[in-house]
Curated annotation (Swiss-Prot):
GO terms for cellular component: chloroplast thylakoid membrane; photosystem I reaction center. GO terms for biological process: photosynthesis. This is Photosystem I reaction center subunit IV. The keyword Membrane applies. NCBIfam families: PRK02749.1.
Length: 62
């Protein structure tokens, strides 16, 4: 998984559950949710990004 990769969301409580987004950034410092994912549609707060852990994503490649 790298910047620009397409990923599918597995976190059930997420607004974007089962949606496909693009990896915008990855943090290597050891934080809990290091992968920032950008989506086409916005959520109810008018936000189109969210952070996820590696095990909450399926890498679909570029």
């Amino acid at each position: 998984m790298e910047r620009g990769s397409k990923v599918k969301i597995l976190r059930k409580e997420s607004y974007w559950y089962q949606e496909i987004g693009t990896v915008a950034a990855m943090d290597k410092s050891g934080i809990k949710y290091p992968v920032l994912v950008r989506f086409e549609k916005v959520n109810y707060n008018n936000v189109n990004t969210n952070s996820f852990a590696d095990n909450e994503l399926i890498d679909l490649g570029k």
